[in-house]
């Protein structure tokens, strides 16, 4: 933003990997982040969830990080383009490292003109107060797994090697993510030296199943997505009922019910024998397969039809 004389000029620099925008006030007109003045020639870091006011608190903005990709695994286009769900599919949407064919996108959202569903921070004053929504997602989840795993509010188990969090958008009644504390971007980075860690992650996943109150009536699978849509290695522990409103697309379904979902034990054996994990280059094509029931293999035309069909298996 800049006035004719440069009085309200700001310099914004986005660091997409770290999930913040550096705000530097060049002009003299007051600029604030969460109502704290930046100061002329000073700079602060603004993260998703904070509100930037330009020129005497007249123009509030928030920042949103998303991703764009022709082959985005988990509906990245849907996340960016829809107002209602900016952070779909396990909120696997940011902090992406070394993932090919993906570009980061930073949006500065004018909270007055385009986002009537944004909730302001507690310290800000806005006519939209009381509405739910996007802003809540822009807190820690929009910054990716690396920040989420550090948040005690979402941790359900932790030890010296791993932490378990509930999937923000669970695709079944029970859906956890087991993550290592060590920074490991994906299965591509795994070597034989990580074998013990993978075995430990699997054991932690089994522990989550054992403490589940529905363990006697539900089947579970432990595994990894062939092409993860966010960085930081994570093991899915998911019940096989797939009874969840967050399961909305064919890609969601196929990512857990085709060979796109790599069984944890098979990954461990691959690392043990080959020293690395190899993934089929055409794995993304699996997401386009027709919808089939994972239990009886009946083909269904739509997600609503599939969900109705699944209910037949629950009662057996």
UniProtKB/Swiss-Prot annotation:
Residues 167-171, 229-230 are annotated as: Interaction with DNA substrate. Residues 142-247 form the HIT domain. It catalyses: a 5'-end adenosine-5'-diphospho-5'-2'-deoxyribonucleoside-DNA + H2O = a 5'-end 5'-phospho-2'-deoxyribonucleoside-DNA + AMP + 2 H(+); a 5'-end adenosine-5'-diphospho-5'-ribonucleoside-2'-deoxyribonucleotide-DNA + H2O = a 5'-end 5'-phospho-ribonucleoside-2'-deoxyribonucleotide-DNA + AMP + 2 H(+); a 3'-end 2'-deoxyribonucleotide-3'-diphospho-5'-guanosine-DNA + H2O = a 3'-end 2'-deoxyribonucleotide 3'-phosphate-DNA + GMP + 2 H(+). GO terms for molecular function: DNA 5'-adenosine monophosphate hydrolase activity; DNA-3'-diphospho-5'-guanosine diphosphatase; double-stranded RNA binding; mismatched DNA binding; single-strand break-containing DNA binding; single-stranded DNA binding; zinc ion binding. Gene3D superfamilies: 2.60.200.20, HIT-like. Residues 104-142 are annotated as: Disordered. A zinc finger (C2H2-type) spans 291-313. A motif (Histidine triad motif) lies at residues 232-236. The active site is at 234 (tele-amp-histidine intermediate). InterPro entries: FHA_2, Histidine_triad_CS, HIT-like, HIT-like_sf, SMAD_FHA_dom_sf, Znf-C2HE, Znf_C2H2_type. Residues 110-130 have a biased composition (Polar residues). GO terms for biological process: single strand break repair. CDD domains: aprataxin_related. The record marks 148, 225, 236, 251 as: Interaction with DNA substrate. Residues 1-38 form the FHA-like domain. It is found in: Nucleus, Nucleoplasm; Nucleus, Nucleolus. Its EC number is 3.6.1.71, 3.6.1.72. One of its GO terms (cellular component) is nucleolus. Keywords: DNA damage, DNA repair, DNA-binding, Hydrolase, Metal-binding, Nucleus, Zinc, Zinc-finger. It is an enzyme of class 3 (hydrolase). DNA-binding protein involved in single-strand DNA break repair, double-strand DNA break repair and base excision repair. Resolves abortive DNA ligation intermediates formed either at base excision sites, or when DNA ligases attempt to repair non-ligatable breaks induced by reactive oxygen species. Catalyzes the release of adenylate groups covalently linked to 5'-phosphate termini, resulting in the production of 5'-phosphate termini that can be efficiently rejoined. The histidine triad, also called HIT motif, forms part of the binding loop for the alpha-phosphate of purine mononucleotide. This is Aprataxin. The lineage of its organism: Eukaryota, Metazoa, Chordata, Craniata, Vertebrata. The gene is APTX.
């Amino acid at each position: 933003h800049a006035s004719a004389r440069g009085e309200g000029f700001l310099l914004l620099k986005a660091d997409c990997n770290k999930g913040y925008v550096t705000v530097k006030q060049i002009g003299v007109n007051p600029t604030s982040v969460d109502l704290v003045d930046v100061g002329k020639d000073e700079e602060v870091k603004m993260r998703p969830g904070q509100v930037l006011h330009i020129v005497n608190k007249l123009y509030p903005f928030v920042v949103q990080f998303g991703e764009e990709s022709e082959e985005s695994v988990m509906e990245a286009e849907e996340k960016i383009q829809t107002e209602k769900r900016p952070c779909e599919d396990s909120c696997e949407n940011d902090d992406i490292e070394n993932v090919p064919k993906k570009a980061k996108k930073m949006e500065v959202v004018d909270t007055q003109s385009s986002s009537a569903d944004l909730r302001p921070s507690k310290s800000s004053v806005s006519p939209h107060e009381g509405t739910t929504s996007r802003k809540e997602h822009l807190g820690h989840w929009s910054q990716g797994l690396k920040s989420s795993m550090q948040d005690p509010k979402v941790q359900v188990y932790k030890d010296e090697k791993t932490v378990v969090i509930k999937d923000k958008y669970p695709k079944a009644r029970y859906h956890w993510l087991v993550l290592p504390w060590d920074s490991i971007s994906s299965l591509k980075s795994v070597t034989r030296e990580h074998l013990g860690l993978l075995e430990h992650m699997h054991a932690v996943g089994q522990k989550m199943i054992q403490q589940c109150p529905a363990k006697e009536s539900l089947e579970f699978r432990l595994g990894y997505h062939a092409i993860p849509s966010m960085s930081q290695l994570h093991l899915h522990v998911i019940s096989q009922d797939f009874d969840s409103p967050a399961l909305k697309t064919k890609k969601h379904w196929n990512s857990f019910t085709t060979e796109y979902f790599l069984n944890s034990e098979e990954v461990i054996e691959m690392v043990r024998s080959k020293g690395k994990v190899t993934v089929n280059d055409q794995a993304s094509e699996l997401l386009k397969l027709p919808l089939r029931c994972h239990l009886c293999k009946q083909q269904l035309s739509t997600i609503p039809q599939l969900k109705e069909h699944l209910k037949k298996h629950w009662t057996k």
